[in-house]
Amino acid sequence: MAFGCARFAAVTATKPTITRLDRQQRLLAVGLVLGVTMVAFEITAVLTALPSITDQLHGDSLYGVALACYTLANLVALVVTGELTDRFGPAKPYLASLTVFAGGLIVAATARTMVLVVIGRALQGAGTGGLAPIAYVLVKRAFPVDRQPKMYAYLSAGWVLPSLIAPGVAGTVTDHFGWRWVFWLLLPLIPVVAVMTVRPMRAYASVGTLRGSRIAAAIFAAAGMGTFVTALQFKNIAAAIGGVIAGLTVGLPSLRRLLPSGVHRAARGLPAVVACRMLATAAFLGVDSFIPLAADRIHDASPTIQGFVIIGAALSWTSGQWFMAQHPQIDPRRAVRWGFAMIGLGICAVLPVLSSGWPLWATFLGWAIGGWGMGLLFNPTTVTAMSHARQGAEGLVSSQVNLADAVGFSTMGGIGGAMVALSDRTSLSLPGALGINFALAFALAGLGAICAGHIAAA
């Protein structure tokens, strides 16, 4: 759900504009916003349907893998499409991304095993991962300077409606027609987005300078993180430890090439911003991704109710974004600290969902606090990060921020999934397993509040 808000959350205060857009620019703007809306609906709806999918296909042990593989494929696609866009322009990479996304929807919709769902999710992640950096590039290249802040606002607004209705729609569709239709219903939007965007994109060629390729590093980083996440699911302790070590050995050096130097110690400036994004995504989504599972397995809630529980956080996330857009004078360090504090408070507020006697409406309200915190910190981190981008290198910085989101989400998704799998085959209860994940997320929020002090604009 919320992992995809990070993609399009750069909203800044706007001055009245006088530049008129031509027909091609207007068509492109509508198409880009529709593309964001499509991705937002997919992310939010699938998160709601996933407990039902794993239940029907007996795939609890792959719950975390289904979350993480989407993000890992996203990671590679971010780098690949960013480089292809710099070299060849945005049209062909964007069309290829839409095609891969469509293939992923079809694979998941027809899947008879959880392994095929995981493959479909990986293809979906690869497709949507290509859309985000291209959208940022096009805002810079296709629209006048005085229109760019408003375009970021429109892209962000593309998340509002899906955040409100996708969980409920996905739950209702799953209840009455089956979870496969959650994937099928998105397919008709893809050709519409393609028709509206691809042709106008051909007018905007590359303006950036060619850099050394980072694709190999992205592949190794994804392979390492995938090995790490998969190893966490192994029953054999020795195999799990070996897999974790192998994953870290392959993944960490590659991530160091992809992320700003000094991100591991939250060095002042861009590294601290990227570190905060990674910690925020890990802390928030490490809880948000498992609330529907808790509602399903602990409270025996229907898919509709599972989706409803996380709507509050989605709405408050958007509200927090727009609040920061209207108050750009707030120091980003203060805003990010407030954001992490709200995330931590929200985690404490939803911890009782692990008890079967706790009312789910209280979880709805409690997790809205965490969503507000995410809204407070995402605009300042995005705007501050982009202030460090040199002309022609906006895509590089944008991809680094998005990579941080991917790393944070996939890591906590893998750890949380491992806890769920462990509860299946040991005496550890599911509430206990999720409680460990929630506690780790709370600790990461606290660490993020400390790192926020190193944030600085260029």
Task: For the regions a language model picked out, list residue spans one by one.
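12-transmembrane solute porter fold
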Residues: Q25-F41, V46-T48, L67-C69, V79-V80, ...
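Hydrophobic alpha-helical transmembrane and interfacial-helix anchor sites in secondary transporters
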Residues: I53, L84, V173, Q326-H327, ...
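Extracellular/periplasmic helix-loop-helix junction of adjacent transmembrane segments
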Residues: A49-L75
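A helix-boundary/kink motif common to multi-pass secondary transporters
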Residues: H58-G59, G89-P90, T113, P144, ...
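Paired intracellular helix-loop junctions of major facilitator superfamily
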Residues: G59, V139-P149, A385-E394
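Hydrophobic transmembrane-helix bundles of small-molecule transporters
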Residues: D175-F284, D288
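Helix-loop-helix hairpins in multi-pass membrane proteins, especially solute transporters
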Residues: L75, T81-R211
